[in-house]
């Protein structure tokens, strides 16, 4: 997301979390220090630095090198999960997961988010995987990794910008209370992470066929 919209959205999400009675803790690495609970100034610094190319993109693989260099870094889903789990944070929200890229049979391009979901005990609330990915293969790989994907108020997994992917949700939760029970049981059994897949509002969503045409045209 371009600056300054990235900063505006991050602060708006924090405000929404507070309004719901929870405590937000935006995660990143600032001057080599992994930080769970960035200040508004630190969010501004990382948001602006991303546009300037001075902020590193950090998955699990990249965090130690960023710390050693005392550099700034914005965490991917996998990086955020790692730091959240280390701090005892059990739930985080993001737009969408990384997963299996289109053409992965040749490129082997699969996001580090998938193995991290199997490893770190964090519930990731999102609109499933990003639309540019191969969504059926992503769903299949998550199944192989033993990662539950819970459709929140839907029997069909969302597709980031779209409420519909054509992929059946492996399990569903009708409301937050039901989702919380699934999360609690999963963590009690020490089974790693899981995904709570929340579709975008239908009035704001985009038809998946339109998204696919745009992606195919760009590839």
Where are these regions (language model features)?
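Solvent-exposed alpha-helices and their adjacent loops that cap or buttress functional pockets
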Residues: 18-19, 82-86, 91-93, 109, ...
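A glycine- and small-aliphatic-rich helix-loop capping segment at beta-alpha/alpha-beta transitions
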Residues: 3-11, 42-48, 98-118, 141
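A C-terminal functional module that forms or caps the active site or interfaces directly
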Residues: 195-197, 201-219
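Active-site glycine-rich loop that binds ribose-phosphate moieties when present
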Residues: 76-77, 105-118, 122-143, 175-181
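Anionic-ligand binding region
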Residues: 163-187
